[in-house]
Amino acid sequence: AWRTYLLDNLLQPAAVWATLAAFASDQHLGCVFPAFYKLLKEGMTHAGTPPYSTSTEYSMILDLMSRMGLPGEYARSEQFFSGGTMFWYRPQALQPLLECGLRFEDFPEEPIGVGGTLAHALERIPPLVCTRRGYRVRSLTCFPSIQYPPERFQD
């Protein structure tokens, strides 16, 4: 359900057109992604895993931001990110991230669990990079009805 939600809200024709229109109408828009998937957030909360950064992820985020030459400190209120690391972006907005030299070898082998890894820290980075570079970030959800699959409400 989560993958369907992300793919539909990123790649369905209506979502693509809405996203392209948003970028065309706002030259300072740097990153667009669907709203955080509600069932994922509920599952994380139930498991005791915060949807904002853990202390391990926070430390990795600070290191990555420093590596890119950008201010790293941030408030939890800035934790607005794409769960699943699937989004549209303006290349100039994320240039430091694209050039920071991350390699495949920097990431642990799968399965990686639900938090505390470089992949989870990296998931939270794009909006921070965009805003530090003067770009805006927004969520755009064209198909909110697929947030909760029908079987969730059956007895």
Can you say where each PLM-predicted feature lies in the sequence?
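ER/Golgi luminal nucleotide-sugar-dependent glycosyltransferases, focusing on the catalytic module
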Residues: 1-155
